[in-house]
């Protein structure tokens, strides 16, 4: 679900001005789209996922009101709760966090897109749920302990297993280490891997590095603070 609206064409109903949150999200979305427009070769192909983790239902509804069709959560409890309380059939819900095998069945029931997949056993658990969710494999180039994601050397094996299980594998997801050079290296390598595997989606880029990601081939950016402002929790992963 990509947006074809350029920043120059972005207009919203006058009634938005009466809701301060929607007005603020609309203004911030215009800024995000402007950043994409200055860096992506094909800005219309870059999907914006509104990362609503730790935010309330109001932010999810504001994102939908300004035309965003994709929202992302990192915690299964939040994903379940918000999806159950919002009746929209047009929103596409992304699970973006690390996967715990004992929670995969719950995730499969409420996620339309499952990112962060980095192990064969996770793929097998997802397949056992008979879900049609879109799957992204997460790749990590740092090798650091505690970071989610598979080593680049194992991505071929994971992709082959996902396909053998007949999962809806569509792309790769990457969270770059801090710093421009690290981001450039990670995003370039992710694009090369996706191309080699014949995967059309590259979920790369967040609030602080989306320009670099778009320049290097991202088809999806995941932004929270750029749309909604500071989080109420100390997490800064989006």
Regions found by a protein language model. Name each.
Residues 2, 7-201, 206-208, 214-216, ...:
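Conserved alpha/beta-domain cores
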Residues 234-238:
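Active-site loop ensemble at the mouth of alpha/beta enzyme cores that anchors a bound cofactor
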